[in-house]
Amino acid sequence: MLSLACLLLWSWPSLAHHALSEYDSAHVTTIEGTLSEIRIKNPHSTLMVQASGSSGPADRWTVEWLAALVLKSEGVENTTLRPGDHLIITGNPSKEPGARRLWLRTVTRPADGWTWTGGF
């Protein structure tokens, strides 16, 4: 029992979400585009989105999402979203200037009105 307690206390800092520190929680960005790739996995799932640019070619965005286990508990499966889906995504942008990365807060598929909202 003592060993288990020590292990939990020792590993607790690693449970902190280091990835969230990479994103600017004070700002929200919205992108709209086509899902090109989806990876539902642990520790974070990822969406690759070709977002419509205001002028010129579409920009490829990397959108980080929650872990597969968390998403599954919220009803999101590997087949919920598919490449080719048109999506509107809001999230916190990367703190790195010019990086096209978001931490997902909401995702909507306008074709059928499916929406997911949540996150840390």
Kindly label every feature range from the protein language model:
Residues 11-13:
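N-terminal signal peptide c-region/cleavage motif recognized by signal peptidases
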Residues 54-66:
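A short macromolecule-binding patch
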Residues 23-31:
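Short coil-to-beta-strand transition motifs
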Residues 65-73:
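Short, structured beta-strand/loop micro-motifs enriched in basic residues and often containing a Trp
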Residues 73-89:
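Short nucleic-acid-contacting surface segments enriched for D/E, G, S/T with interspersed K/R
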Residues 33-35:
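Conserved hydrophobic positions within beta-strands
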Residues 41-52:
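Short aromatic-glycine-enriched beta-strand elements
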Residues 94-120:
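OB-fold/S1-family single-stranded nucleic acid-binding modules
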